[in-house]
């Protein structure tokens, strides 16, 4: 198919930093940094909004987890502030904080247009010499004795040194072609779009993304 014709086009496009794995935190930090520069480097609009995000804690276990994750983020250079209820209201004046013990405010978070980001990545890849083949289904992959990979497509076979499984929702099927079980499960998410909310518009600033565990 075309680029972004699968699940990408209707993704939320949220770019978070908050994660407890050091290696994944490094990847998140790199990705967020890349998205802030991608439009300038490629000329392709990405819709980046660096609005930050607040993740809320409702019990002591979550508070303890927030302290742990902040330690991880400090190691990779991602800015994270642990806020009390009054401080949360300063960042997000419209948020009702009753019942919350703490908020983890990651200032480098944001959101993008997933389709725009994908197209920008494609532009950057082509600028670096990559070739992109559209509407060309992969039907099989084979590991050759040389250590190279043979990728069988509907329009011919490609031999490559490295094969990256970036099939998204279909990565399990692509993994099976190589005899690999990919531990991935698809999940259904919901979102709704609202009309303009006068109270939000009156603030004249973009509010951070809020993650409520309840």
Give residue ranges: language-model regions.
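Flavin-dependent oxidoreductases
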Residues: 16, 141-214
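Short beta-strand
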Residues: 8, 45-49, 183-185, 210
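A short, glycine/Asx- and small/polar-enriched loop/turn
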Residues: 61, 92-100, 142-150
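Glycine-rich FAD pyrophosphate-binding loop
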Residues: 1-9
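Residue-level detector of anion-binding/catalytic polar loops
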Residues: 79, 131, 181
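General beta-strand structural signal in soluble alpha/beta enzymes
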Residues: 81-84, 132-134, 165, 211
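Helical element adjacent to the flavin cofactor pocket in flavoenzyme catalytic cores
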Residues: 104-162, 170
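Dinucleotide-binding Rossmann-like beta1-alpha1 core, especially the glycine-rich loop
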Residues: 13-91, 213-214
């Amino acid at each position: 198919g075309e680029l972004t014709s699968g699940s990408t086009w209707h993704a939320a496009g949220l770019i978070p930093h908050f994660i407890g794995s050091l290696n994944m935190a490094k990847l998140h930090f790199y990705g967020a940094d890349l998205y802030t520069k991608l439009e300038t480097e490629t000329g392709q609009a990405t819709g980046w909004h660096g609005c930050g995000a607040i993740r809320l804690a409702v019990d002591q276990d979550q508070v303890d987890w927030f302290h742990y994750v902040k330690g991880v983020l400090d190691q990779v250079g991602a800015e994270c502030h642990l806020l009390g209820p009054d401080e949360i209201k300063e960042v997000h004046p419209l948020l009702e904080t009753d019942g919350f013990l703490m908020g983890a405010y990651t200032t480098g978070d944001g959101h993008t247009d997933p389709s725009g980001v994908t197209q920008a990545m494609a532009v950057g890849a082509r600028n670096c010499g990559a070739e992109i083949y559209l509407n060309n289904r992969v039907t099989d992959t084979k590991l050759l004795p040389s250590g190279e990979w043979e990728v069988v497509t509907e329009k011919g076979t490609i031999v490559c040194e490295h094969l990256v499984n970036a099939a998204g929702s279909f990565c399990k099927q692509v993994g099976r072609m190589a005899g690999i079980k990919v531990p991935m499960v698809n999940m259904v998410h919901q979102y709704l779009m609202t009309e303009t909310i006068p109270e939000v518009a009156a603030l004249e600033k973009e509010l951070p993304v809020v993650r409520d565990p309840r």
